[in-house]
Amino acid sequence: MNKLWADVAWDEYLAWQSEDKKTLIRINSLIKDIETNGLAVGIGKPEFLKYLKRWSRRIDEKNRLIYDIDENKNLWIISCKGHYED
């Protein structure tokens, strides 16, 4: 499965590399779990965001991984910092 990053998500991911390695490890674990188990099953309490038409998993209490898989089976990372309601 190819991983494609929205520009803002990639910037957030790079920021985690210098800000918090523990969070970066958690994000990587969530991505691996999505690749293994799919959109709706696995760690991080997968949740469909009906208004955004995307999926969300908990990185921690304050941050969510927002993602989707397109028709070509590419995993799109939309955001990995903050909360979708922010």
Describe each region flagged by the PLM.
Residues K32-R58:
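A short, surface-exposed loop/turn module that caps and links secondary-structure elements
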Residues L24-K32:
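PIN-domain endoribonuclease scaffold, especially VapC-family toxins
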Residues N2-L4, V8-I25, R58-R64, D68-D86:
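Enriched for short, Lys/Arg-rich terminal
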